A protein has these predicted regions:
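Short phosphate-binding loop-to-helix
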Residues: 61, 67-126
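Hydrophobic/aromatic residues located in beta-strands of well-ordered beta-sheets
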Residues: 19, 59-62, 106, 136-137, ...
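Short, acidic/turn-prone active-site loops that include or flank metal/cofactor-
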Residues: 25, 84-90, 235-237
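N-terminal glycine-rich phosphate-binding loop and ensuing alpha1 helix
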Residues: 13-64
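A conserved hydrophobic position in a structured secondary element of the catalytic/binding core
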Residues: 64-65, 116, 194, 241
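Short, high-confidence coil segments that cap the C-terminus of an alpha-helix
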Residues: 57, 103, 131-134, 226
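Conserved alpha/beta core of the MobA/IspD/sugar-nucleotide pyrophosphorylase nucleotidyltransferase superfamily
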Residues: 182-267
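Conserved core of the sugar-phosphate nucleotidyltransferase
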Residues: 117-208
Length: 267
């Protein structure tokens, strides 16, 4: 696929990739969720170990300004980078990490994506290796339930024929029949990758009007006139955001065949 028209500020031809997990303790909707225990391990450690299952040997770092998180990661032998405690978002925290490292691309893995599977990470990493001139990748997945079209907690998007993300929103703007919309609208997953230059631009530029309106960070990139490449995954698992999510996640870990396989590898 031609990448003409994608964000072309990256000049790297041999990408040096890191998986980075930005983490903090003061989650508003579920305080201290980073260290919530699942099967004897903190949630963050589940995510870190899953990151290490990537087939490319890409290193996994946790970056945080919270001593509890730093200690927990170090106790398990993980790679950790100490950041300022106060950051506007995870991308800003990863930008601070990038300024201390020589990596060219950063796969940002959210610390609440406890059910991420290796093939999802590998799909993004492979795309970076094949097309390092692209500067922003975001994983997307088809919608499953019709109510996701209007559920504003589900961030959604429309794709172009070249896999470019055309627009991002919380409520579908389409007027077509629901079944047609279900075929056209995709869900944005909490897994994306970004080049060093694009990361700096995202972190240093002021928030844009649409970004503020929808509270969707990727909208800044599109508003500034740049483009995001989508990587489609056929299956998407929920993340941990609310107290009621904990029971659902626990059930999936015990009943989903692929999750059982991955869990055995990290415990």
């Amino acid at each position: 696929m031609s990448t003409v028209g994608f964000f072309q500020i990256s000049q790297f031809t041999t990408p040096q990739i890191a998986i980075v997990i930005p983490a903090r303790m003061d989650s508003q909707r579920l305080p201290n969720k980073a260290l919530l225990p699942f099967h004897g391990l903190p949630m963050l450690e589940h995510v870190r170990r899953r990151g290490e299952l990537n087939s490319h040997g890409i290193p996994v770092f946790v970056t945080s300004g919270d001593p509890q998180i730093i200690t927990a990661v170090e106790d398990f032998g993980g790679l950790v980078s100490i950041s300022k405690k106060d950051h506007l978002n995870g991308t800003s925290r990863v930008h601070e990490f990038s300024e201390q490292r020589v990596f060219t691309h950063f796969l940002i893995l959210q610390g609440d994506e406890i059910l991420v599977i290796p093939e999802q990470l590998d799909a993004i990493i492979s795309s970076i290796v094949e097309q390092p001139e692209v500067d922003f990748w975001n994983m997307v997945t088809p919608l499953v339930e019709e109510d996701e079209l209007v559920n504003q907690s589900v961030v959604k998007c429309l794709l172009g024929q070249n896999s470019e993300i055309l627009s991002i929103f919380r409520k579908s703007p389409l007027c077509a029949d629901v079944m047609v919309q279900m075929e056209l609208v995709y869900k944005i997953c909490g897994l994306f990758a970004i080049s060093r230059q694009a990361l700096a631009l995202m972190s240093e530029m002021d928030s844009t009007p649409l970004e503020k309106c929808e509270s969707i960070e990727q909208l800044k990139f599109i508003e500034l006139g740049y483009r995001i490449k989508s990587i489609t995954t056929p299956i998407s698992y929920p993340s941990v955001n609310l107290p009621e999510d904990v029971e659902n996640i626990t059930d999936i870990l015990l009943t989903d065949r692929r999750q059982i396989e991955v869990l055995k590898k990290i415990l």
